[in-house]
Amino acid sequence: MSTSLTKADLAEKLYEELGFNKREAKELVEHFFEEIRNSLEDNEQVKLSGFGNFDLRDKKQRPGRNPKTGEEIPITARRVVTFRPGQKLKARVEAYAGTKS
């Protein structure tokens, strides 16, 4: 089973490696993600150099199907957040592909 990196883990890393106190580290992580959320709410692209880009994309309404009944139902139009990894992130992930289980 794979593990997940959480916001609490990020705050702990800031505490251990950069010397922030635990409260400051938690606030920094929360503020970082709040800024990303605010930018996306304001229809702005979020570009994190060396990591990737968060974009908003509008999806049109389309036909769908209820898997239990087979009944056709419309899937409403909506806005979604997409993430496109940057070249550096892609290269690092590809370099480690298949080395961990």
UniProtKB/Swiss-Prot annotation:
Heterodimer of an alpha and a beta chain. CDD domains: IHF_A. This is Integration host factor subunit alpha. GO terms for biological process: DNA recombination; positive regulation of metabolic process; regulation of DNA-templated transcription; regulation of translation. It comes from Saccharophagus degradans (strain 2-40 / ATCC 43961 / DSM 17024). It comes from the Bacteria. Belongs to the bacterial histone-like protein family. This protein is one of the two subunits of integration host factor, a specific DNA-binding protein that functions in genetic recombination as well as in transcriptional and translational control.
